[in-house]
């Protein structure tokens, strides 16, 4: 092979590689747009708030168990879960054992959730062990 044929072969390989890269980029972009559209259509602001509240509630229970802010529950508190009303504006946090959840612990958990998540207190009502 002479040098001219080598240049043509290398040029074709480079062009195929470039075309493949553009095709891959187009497919990737279309996938990202589709996923983004799906998520924006199926998850609302309220869903994000509930997720944030759940994470903050778990952290608040861990902090309460560690004696944070002078809280002494005398037992290990267990985060039991979260539920919400149909309109997702009333959020309920379940912690056990219920008999050891004092008003001080409830207030700490609710205050911690509002402070960390920065959600509007007049829009969302958080209750511990309803």
Curated annotation (Swiss-Prot):
- Subcellular location per the Swiss-Prot or TrEMBL entry: Secreted; Cell surface; Fimbrium
Q: Which GO terms describe its cellular component?
A: cell surface; extracellular region; membrane
Q: Which Pfam families match?
A: Class_IIIsignal
User: What residue intervals hold the motif QXSXEXXXL?
Assistant: 15-23
Please describe the post-translational modifications of this protein. The N-terminus is cleaved by the prepilin peptidase EppA, which recognizes the class III signal sequence.
Residue ranges the record assigns to the propeptide: 1-14
Keywords from the UniProt entry: Fimbrium, Secreted
InterPro entries to which the protein is assigned, alphabetical: Class3_signal_pept_motif
The protein's predominant localisation is: secreted
Query: What's in the domain note?
Result: Contains an amino terminal motif QXSXEXXXL, which is part of a class III signal sequence.
* Name this polypeptide is given: Probable pilin MJ0835.1
Q: What's the source species for this entry?
A: Methanocaldococcus jannaschii (strain ATCC 43067 / DSM 2661 / JAL-1 / JCM 10045 / NBRC 100440)
């Amino acid at each position: 092979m002479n040098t001219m044929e080598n240049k043509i072969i290398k040029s074709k390989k480079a062009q195929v590689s470039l075309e493949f890269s553009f095709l891959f980029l187009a497919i990737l972009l279309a996938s990202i747009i589709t996923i983004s559209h799906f998520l924006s259509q199926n998850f609302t602001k309220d869903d994000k708030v509930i997720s944030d509240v759940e994470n903050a509630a778990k952290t608040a229970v861990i902090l309460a168990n560690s004696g944070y802010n002078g809280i002494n529950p005398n037992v290990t508190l267990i985060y039991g879960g979260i539920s919400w009303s149909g309109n997702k504006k009333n959020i309920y946090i379940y912690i056990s054992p219920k008999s050891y959840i004092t008003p001080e612990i409830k207030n700490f958990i609710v205050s911690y959730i509002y402070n960390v998540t920065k959600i509007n207190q007049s829009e969302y009502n958080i209750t511990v062990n309803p």
